[in-house]
Amino acid sequence: MNVAPHSVPQDSNTMKTTLPYNRKYVLFAIYEVLDKFGSKYEKMDSSTFLSEISVYGNKSRFSISVDEQPFGTELTVTMLRPCEGLSDSGIQRSVTAVADSISQYLENELEINRLKA
């Protein structure tokens, strides 16, 4: 299955992205990205994480969740509490950066590194 990721900004605080990967790979990528950001997290259920993440030097609270779909996994990143003074465009950039970090991790691990082997 070769399905391109499809991102849909919901509002400035939320982004949904359908990734062409199995749910377990997306969950693993979330753990790896949270570790890379040095972020502590709370696992709310089997599909949702809450975390304080510093993006571009601004620490904000995010919800990151996954939902398995017929053709991949839907990743939803929502900024629950922005850093004080963060503009709407700053919020959108931060949400996009977190979603892109997860997507890029998956691409690197499952696509690019496989080609190098």
Predicted regions and their residues:
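Ser/Thr-rich, low-complexity intrinsically disordered terminal regions
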Residues: M1-A117
